[in-house]
Amino acid sequence: DMSHTDAMTASTSSESGEMMNSDATTIGSATLSLSISGLTNLGAAFAYEGWLIVDGQPISTGIFTVSDDGMASATEFVLSVDPVTASSFVLTVEPSPDPDPTPSAVHLLAGDLADGSAQLSVAHAAALGQDFAGASGAYILGIGYPAGLQTGNSYRNGIWMPSLNLPQLPSGWAYEGWVIGADGPITTGRFTAPGTQDSDGSGSAAGGPGTGPNFPGQDFLSQPIDLTSGYAAAITIEPEPDNSPAPFSALKPLADAMIEDVGDHGAQGFVNEAASFPSGRISISN
């Protein structure tokens, strides 16, 4: 395990104070190695960027992308700063190309540095600040905007989420509900707090923004969708601003693989999938 050996070397030299001397690490000679699982392709207009926090200030460690099969375009980065002075590492989602040299508000992973390495998680206070292991909830089938009912509509054309137990998100993130069928995912709206209307209310196929009950959901009335005909339901955590109209599948705290017909307003539970969230580590070597 080279990374472990390198991390040990870095920690040994820093403990003896050699890195502060003139014959020690010169800026630009230390390498940061990144090993992260669970990252997804952000599309052509966005990229991942690493940051070392030095005296409270972010210093970029470099930009990389991730392919559809989860492979990073780069995993080793030559540092432009003395890593001994760094306290933590943060991974953000950035526009590409990026007109702003500072980090975006979309902090995905972070970790504190100790002995030249850091474990990275979404739960770190500099990332999302929660591990989402306690996220839970249920949804019902039913019509949230009865004024939009048309001939042939039924409770199977609406999905609503009245009982969601989700933590508050930091700036840079929003929740989004989805139904996923053979033709791909369809949004049910974005929201920041579970007990509020989502961004599109009862949806464009019903009454639109500002209509429906005070919790997230969607009616598919003017273009009816039978949600019991092979659809899944999910809630993702999305970058704000969003990198793509598709689900940010790396952060999907709640999902149900099959919406079943349990009757009008019958509750169906979500499964917690936070264990699949991205995680990893960095190590710094000379």
Where are the predicted features?
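N-terminal targeting/export leaders
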Residues: 1-286
